Amino acid sequence: MPGSSLWLLPPKSHRLNSILPTLIDQTSSHFGSAHRFLPHVTITSEISPSTHSPNPQAWLDSLEISSGDKIEVMFEKLASEDVFFRKLYIKCHKTEGLKKLAVLCRREVEGFGEEREAAKWATESYNPHLSLLYHDCPSIDASGLAEIEKLAQSTGVNLNGQSDLGGWSGGRLVLVPTDKSIDQWSPIAEREL
């Protein structure tokens, strides 16, 4: 994936921080994928490293994120696409706060500096989701989705956005250089929201 990405993680104290890595591990094992990664909702990608150099933390802290915006991640359902990074994921509702954050962050990507372009992208292209599987295989069929739904339920994750295990409020925005191999994807800056 070219450039860097901004990911939204659950707040440090949220129970999903310990549950979601287990679900990703079980899902990856079930489908024979070697890829493991930090549970996250991608806010935007394709940020040029020159944008946040030489001080990624200072750059992340400089983003004008309003503390008044309620940023909520609400799980909706399991889904699969024939795309490596969206092979199997939890689709999330495009809440107003999440959409506003996506617009603000997308403006940091070359070609989206104007509010209008970033807002169009957030409305037409942004698909908030939490990946459970990166894999080079066909999209997951209905029986595979049903198996992972049972796994999710056994961990307590609520795929319908209900209860505290159906998403989270706020969280941590992290900057990750995603132009490296997946096993090297680690945050280089973090900001509490």
UniProtKB/Swiss-Prot annotation:
GO MF annotation list: 2',3'-cyclic-nucleotide 3'-phosphodiesterase activity
GO biological process: cyclic nucleotide metabolic process
Enzyme type, top EC level: hydrolase
SUPFAM superfamilies: LigT-like
InterPro entries (UniProt xref): Cyclic-nucl_3Pdiesterase, Cyclic_Pdiesterase
Localization terms from the record: Golgi apparatus
Enzyme Commission number(s): 3.1.4.37
Keyword annotations of the record: Golgi apparatus, Hydrolase
Catalytic machinery residues: H40 (proton donor/acceptor), H129 (proton donor/acceptor)
One Pfam family linked to the record: CPDase
Reaction catalyzed: a nucleoside 2',3'-cyclic phosphate + H2O = a nucleoside 2'-phosphate + H(+)
Binding site for substrate: T42, S131, Y134
One Gene Ontology cellular component: Golgi apparatus
Function, as annotated: Involved in the metabolism of ADP-ribose 1',2'-cyclic phosphate which is produced as a consequence of tRNA splicing.
Entry-linked PANTHER family: 2',3'-CYCLIC-NUCLEOTIDE 3'-PHOSPHODIESTERASE
Sequence similarity: Belongs to the 2H phosphoesterase superfamily. CPD1 family.
Name of the molecule in the record: 2',3'-cyclic-nucleotide 3'-phosphodiesterase
Name of the gene: CPD1
